[in-house]
Amino acid sequence: MLFFIGAFPSIFVITERNEQVPPSGVPFLLTFIEIQMKNELLHFFVPEKGRRTKRQPISWLCCWAILLGIVCNACSDDDPVKKNPYLQVSTRALLKEVVEVKFNNIDGNTDITVDFGDGTVKEGKAANPITYAYTQSGDYTLHVTAGQYEVQKRIRIYNLLALTEAMKQFREPDNKKVWVMTHRAHTSDRTVPENSVSSVEDAIDSGAEVIECDTHVTSDGVVVVCHDQTINATTNGTGDITKMTYAELQKYNLKDRNGRVTDEKMPTLEEFLKAGRGRIYYNLDYSPRTATSQQVVDIVMKLDMMESVFFYCNSAQKAEEVLGITPKAHVYTWTGSHKPMMGLPGNYFVQYSYLTNGKSTPLGSSINDGMLATVNMLPASGSNVSEWTLNEGYLDELLQIYPMVCMIQTDLPDLLIPALQARGLR
């Protein structure tokens, strides 16, 4: 990346996740060229007394040519800057999330020392990442020494337990807590548009652990959050998301659940995730629908949110696809589609449904295979489950059918949570 200071460029390579160590020879060469350019520009535009103004600025042009060569080379596939040592580390993480610190493009035997900023110092070799899990939230500065290189990097630790750690509670024999997942970020407040940025705040305020949402992709490749593939039901416009550009989507406003038009726009997946980052978990339903798995995973990785997100997969094939991108993904499937997770380290949810078409999903083999049960308590054809009121009789029946339930998905988290508390399940 080039940053221009006045007319004279200097080169830095800095990204959110990687910090480039500048090559030792380049700054001196750039400084020399900059001085020469300043002198030549001065002579060219302000000629000395007695000097002809038509003098050709040969050395000035040479300086520009040299600089252009450096910049062009820096942008090529054989960029020497890319081959210099650089630090790779996340800038955000959750409590007890494993943070990896790695120096790339350096001799593997180089000694590495990492001061994590909380009193913890670890040493190792460049060949292997140095890992650490923070136990307290806050902003920290990492000080990393690798041979002759020294780099500092800021990292924010959110006050939310990483999913890998949080899911362990469901294996504890005395665990009594049932999590609540809010369907489309719904609560009993119908004035908040579903799957909107404001609905994220509403869901967090309700006390739910997880927000469920759906993803689609526009014709120009922007992943957005919406349940339907069309915008007909949720906005004051009409059209198929996959056939509209993101700019076209932004012409329309979201409607609340009473049908009134609001000031809110359909959010991108990135905006939706950022709105609750570090405060609540997300379940990306069908992971994805019209977006590709790679598109969705890339966004989650970019935001350093792999320990905050479930990838719901409606088939074993989709689960394999997501796990093929990253085996660290918290995949989450319909019951019977869980085979790709068997034998993997970690704990995984599978989903059942209460009273869909008048019936509840049989448990099948998922529980015997070590999966954790989540149950939908949602309106469906053939059932009287309401989106607007909580039927506690239905809740009691659900708990009887699925006594091992770990999480319930609902449109009414603010009503379900007190009902679970009254039953000793929070």
What are these regions (language model features)?
Residues 75-83, 149-426:
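Phosphate-group recognition and catalysis centered on beta-loop-alpha active-site segments
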Residues 8, 27, 42, 52, ...:
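Compositionally biased, intrinsically disordered low-complexity regions
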Residues 20:
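Cationic, low-complexity basic patches in intrinsically disordered or flexible, solvent-exposed regions
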Residues 14:
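Conserved NAD(P)+-binding/catalytic subdomain of aldehyde/semialdehyde dehydrogenases
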Residues 1-11, 28-84:
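Bacterial Sec-dependent N-terminal signal peptides
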Residues 75-178:
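Extracellular/lumenal mature domains of secreted and surface-exposed proteins
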